[in-house]
Amino acid sequence: MENDDITVAEMKPKKRAGRRIFKETRHPIYRGVRRRDGDKWVCEVREPIHQRRVWLGTYPTADMAARAHDVAVLALRGRSACLNFSDSAWRLPVPASTDPDTIRRTAAEAAEMFRPPEFSTGITVLPSASEFDTSDEGVAGMMMRLAEEPLMSPPRSYIDMNTSVYVDEEMCYEDLSLWSY
């Protein structure tokens, strides 16, 4: 999709919300995004012909919800979609069909690509102390395996690897001092 064909929300300002509740919850910039429970953002779009709502999910950030919205409107409206981000047309996946479940699944996958690290759901499980074998046999076995493994030579330096570069070694170490006073 060409960038000239894209309509970005910045170029087409949103209409003012009529009801007070929507004034308080909807995002001031992003289309199709509103706040729920203070710290969560939800997203939904309407199908162009049937006017049925397609629920896209709840997200920790407004940016993620806006990306989900962009995936859905690209699937439903194609080139006439009004996007929240100008790079969404080439950066985000477009669902294979206009089925609401397919749109929802693709929108969730696209939003996950933009999940900030502080909202990561990855859980690191540390082993308990009982899982470590600290007995003499365990340590001795580990030492024997290390002794049997072949020694590896240290990695070559950059200068040794790159033979096309001429380097005057005296010039490299001219201002290098071993001691700082």
Curated annotation (Swiss-Prot):
Q: Name one GO cellular component term.
A: nucleus
Q: Is Transport found in the keyword set?
A: no
A GO BP term, please? regulation of timing of transition from vegetative to reproductive phase
Q: Which GO terms describe its molecular function?
A: DNA binding; DNA-binding transcription factor activity
Q: Which residues bind DNA?
A: 29-86
Query: Could you tell me where this protein is found in the cell?
Result: Nucleus
Please give the SUPFAM superfamilies that the UniProt record associates with this protein. Answer: DNA-binding domain
Q: Residue ranges for motif Nuclear localization signal?
A: 14-26
Q: Which UniProt keywords apply?
A: Activator, DNA-binding, Nucleus, Transcription, Transcription regulation
Which domain of life, per UniProt? Eukaryota
> Which PANTHER family does UniProt cross-reference here?
DEHYDRATION-RESPONSIVE ELEMENT-BINDING PROTEIN 1D, DEHYDRATION-RESPONSIVE ELEMENT-BINDING PROTEIN 1E
Family to which this protein belongs? Belongs to the AP2/ERF transcription factor family. ERF subfamily.
Function summary: Transcriptional activator that binds specifically to the DNA sequence 5'-[AG]CCGAC-3'. Binding to the C-repeat/DRE element mediates cold or dehydration-inducible transcription. CBF/DREB1 factors play a key role in freezing tolerance and cold acclimation.
Q: What is this protein called?
A: Dehydration-responsive element-binding protein 1E
What organism is listed for this UniProt entry? Arabidopsis thaliana (Mouse-ear cress)
> Source gene?
DREB1E
